[in-house]
A protein has these predicted regions:
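Predominantly soluble domains enriched in secretory-pathway, periplasmic, or organellar proteins
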Residues: 11-232
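Bacterial N-terminal signal peptides
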Residues: 1-10
Length: 232
């Protein structure tokens, strides 16, 4: 009888909404998207960053295990990027901390509670090794940087939260970091990708973007304005 009752309940009663934060790197904007099981709706557009007339480039995004806060890496800087902390619900900026060159993908460990974010580093000749920043997301303090390979990207942890993995894009090496020791515990050479150096085209697009006149793209400048500068 209970099974029949559940099946015959109206669909709207059983429906559950899911929410996703989605970053738009070219707009300095994060969209809060609601999915009701059938369709997706943009519930809110959140202007992020503190520079009212510059593109800061929101790249990586993750949410705290409790769902109280969400974190955003801002790739562009002078020259270093930042990690931003926002409150879910109000989506107000709480704090930020400076990291390395072009911080990108990130994830929070279930075991340590720390946040691991790769410093992708699109600058320069792409021959220098970069790092993974380890951040205390409660206090918003960078507590360590672990050197890995050239242009590390991707940031994933085991379900246990004990091992962190990222890939050095220019060499194809997979780096394993011991989350407790905060040190590289293993380096795995993956199969070389054909024409890996063609990734330089991606770099060229970023270089060209930096040379472009963004004035015609600043549709968000009025929205951010000097009020955003108050977060600095």
């Amino acid at each position: 009888f209970q099974l029949i009752l559940i099946i015959t309940l109206p669909a709207q009663i059983l429906a559950k909404d899911y929410y996703v934060y989605c970053a738009a790197e070219s707009e300095d904007e994060v969209a809060l998207i609601r999915f009701d099981g059938k369709k997706a709706y943009v519930e809110k557009r959140i202007q992020v960053g503190v520079w009212p007339v510059e593109i800061e480039g929101p790249h990586g995004i993750t949410i705290s295990p409790e769902g109280d806060y969400w974190y955003l890496s801002m790739a562009h800087g002078t020259p270093y990027g930042h990690l931003y902390k926002y409150k879910t619900g109000t989506d107000e900026m709480v704090d930020r901390v400076e990291l390395g060159l072009f911080p990108a993908s990130m994830e929070i460990s279930n075991s340590t509670g720390l946040l691991y974010v790769v410093n992708f580093n699109l600058h320069g000749s792409h021959e220098e090794k970069s790092t993974v920043s380890i951040v205390d997301p409660e206090e918003m303090i960078e507590i360590d940087r672990v050197e890995t390979g050239v242009m590390p990207h991707g940031s994933r942890l085991l379900n246990s939260g004990m091992k962190h993995y990222s890939v050095a894009m220019m060499s194809g090496e997979l780096f394993e970091i011991d989350a407790m020791r905060m040190a590289v515990s293993r380096k795995i050479h993956t199969k070389p990708i054909n024409n890996m150096k063609n990734h330089g085209m991606h770099n060229m697009s970023h270089k060209n973007a930096k040379k472009m006149d963004h004035s015609h793209m600043m549709s968000n400048s009025d929205k951010k304005g000097m009020a955003a500068m108050g977060h600095m």
